Amino acid sequence: MKTILSLFSFIFLLVSCEDVIEIDLDSVEPKLVIEGCINDLDDPCTIKLSKTGDYFEPGIYPIVSDALVTITDENGIETEFEESEPGTYTSESLEVEELGSYTLHIQSEGEDYMAEGVVPHKVFIDSLSYDIPPLFYEFEEGYMLTCYLQDPAEYRNYYRLIVYKKGEPKSSDGMMYIFNDDFMNGNMIFMSWESDPLFPQDTVVVELQTLDKSTYDYYFTLNSLAGGMFGASNPSNPETNLSNDALGYFGAYTVSRDTIVILPN
């Protein structure tokens, strides 16, 4: 029988920084910020472009219009994106295949930006369960949700878990649950959702994303920078796979979803 391993110690938390630090800074040249992922869902693929804000104008992030945005697959088939709204570029015709390699190319204001993403092997949710939490747990009422998945031994895998209730991501404490299969390769893995309790008649959708490494690395760096975790004593820009000093990320992932209704015992 394969070992079932818990991921409690492999949960990375995404927290917000609340302290305001006043520093004298010179105005810097804005950089392009690229946000986009491809996945195996039938939804339109979206790439968002903006620029970093000026320190002296906090909260203002200019959108980037009139860019040329394309994605090319490993067979040389190019898909051009249309600007559906200012700064947002979409395609409904891009066909994404598992284990396929895709190259993003952006031309904006005389500059070229590129990134590559490889769609990972899809890992499915095995099952979902819920139970009364142990004594002295973080919450004393309601039920604790647990997701099980069988990690494939032939791949290095990176995951993100999202829980939805009434169509909205459910995470009252702002946690982002990402983990990999280090020390758990080829095993049945279970993750308990410790962020929020669930109650009778709740209908919960659980989404398991299998991430490519660049997306995982980006999320991991965001976690460490936001929370001051993992030895990040010298804050810097999050790790990215984008060229030409752009910020943000271009990633790929596959999706498995399952639904569970919480019934009273």
Task: State what each model feature region is.
Residues 18-265:
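A sequence/structural signal for flexible, mid-protein segments enriched
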Residues 2-10:
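Sec-dependent signal peptide recognition
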